[in-house]
A protein has these predicted regions:
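Short amphipathic beta-strand starts and helix->beta connectors
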Residues: 44-50, 100-110, 139-142, 185-192
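Acidic, proline/glycine-enriched N-terminal capping motif
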Residues: 1-100, 106, 231-232
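Conserved, structured C-terminal
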Residues: 2-27, 33-35, 115-320
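Well-ordered mid-protein domain cores that form the structural environment of catalytic cofactors
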Residues: 81, 85-139
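Acidic active-site catalytic centers that drive phospho-/nucleotidyl reactions
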Residues: 56, 110, 205
Length: 320
């Protein structure tokens, strides 16, 4: 963990709310973020599994990708130059998990891509959002307009009771299916809502104008089922669910196949598919899909109360 230096850290629109709720604030991806509240990481983790937790993920990047032709299909074709996923197959009102790859097939970042009817809406990782934007501009500026949305916050409401909670503020919420995404009214605010998340639970991610984020967060926290949840529990929840964290489980030296993410590469982009290849790193990734590759990502238990830090050498004294 980096040493705390709030003088150089950015703050999300919910920073004052976190402090008022007694959050322990730590540096993360250039932001002063809540790692936990007084309830502690374990209780926050279990509460999300049993009820509903509210996460501030406003540090993540939100980007609009709009084709200069005005056709969302052209934006999809352009983005398919940079990711191995079938973006043209994402119907309006739906979203898909994807990865930016480099020439060697390594992962530059992972992201969500939503089709909003006349443009694509991307959510990228906080630590990579500036390089992702630069990558998009360098590769696609001749075909697309790239518009970051720094004036929007992003909230994640996660857990088995997330639907019943959000339904009180958004009448459309119960009808949304997993990975549905699009503009919705939430408490009268103009939001972008997806039925998704990164905890392994049912839930919703809500993009809201930054100036309205605290009011919306307070409305959600006023529900008895909802507790504020920090990044510590977000990390343990995604790890328990087997979800990758960029920079830890995946990076530029790991291909999607080596990361056991081949499930995210649709048939249309594979060998023999309708639009096979054509993305950065296609030669390596398609060869691995066809011939196999040893997995670089594994999950195992440590029989100790302390967590292993990133980069430490793991030794098993009883490995067969």
């Amino acid at each position: 963990m980096l040493a705390r230096d709030t003088g150089r850290l950015q703050r999300t629109a919910l920073h004052a709310l976190h402090v008022s709720l007694g959050a322990k604030m730590v540096p993360f991806a250039g932001y002063d973020m809540p790692v936990q509240y007084a309830t502690g990481v374990l209780k926050e983790h279990l509460h999300t599994r049993r009820s509903a937790g509210l996460f501030d993920v406003s540090h993540m990047g939100q980007i609009v990708l709009r084709a200069k032709s005005g056709r969302v299909e052209d934006a999809g074709r352009a983005l398919e130059l940079l990711v191995p996923q079938d973006i043209l197959g994402v119907a309006p009102g739906r979203q898909r998990y994807a990865q930016f790859t480099n020439e060697g097939g390594g992962i530059l970042d992972d992201l969500m891509v939503a089709n909003f009817g006349d443009h694509l809406f991307l959510v990228v990782n906080a630590a990579c959002k500036e390089t992702d934007e630069a990558h998009l501009r360098a590769q696609l500026s001749g075909m697309c307009e790239i518009e970051p949305l720094p004036d929007r916050a992003l909230l994640a409401l996660q857990g088995p009771k997330a639907e019943s909670v959000l339904a009180k503020l958004c009448a459309d919420a119960p009808a949304m299916r997993f990975m549905d995404a699009g503009p919705r009214k939430v408490a009268g605010f103009d939001c972008f809502v997806s039925r998704s998340g990164y905890t392994g639970e049912d839930g919703f991610e809500i993009s809201v104008p930054a100036g309205q984020a605290e009011e919306l967060a307070r409305l959600l926290l006023a529900e008895a089922e909802v507790l504020p949840i920090g990044l510590g529990a977000r990390d343990s929840l995604r790890l328990e669910a087997g979800l990758c964290l960029y920079g830890h489980d995946i990076d530029t030296m790991t291909t999607p196949v080596e990361a056991a993410l081949e499930w995210s590469i649709q048939k249309a982009r594979r060998s023999g598919g309708a639009r096979s290849g054509g993305f950065l790193g296609a030669e390596t990734i398609l060869a691995q899909l066809d011939q196999g590759a040893p997995p670089e990502r594994r999950t195992f238990w440590i029989d100790h109360s302390s967590a292993a830090s990133t980069g430490v050498v793991m030794v098993s004294m009883s490995w067969p």
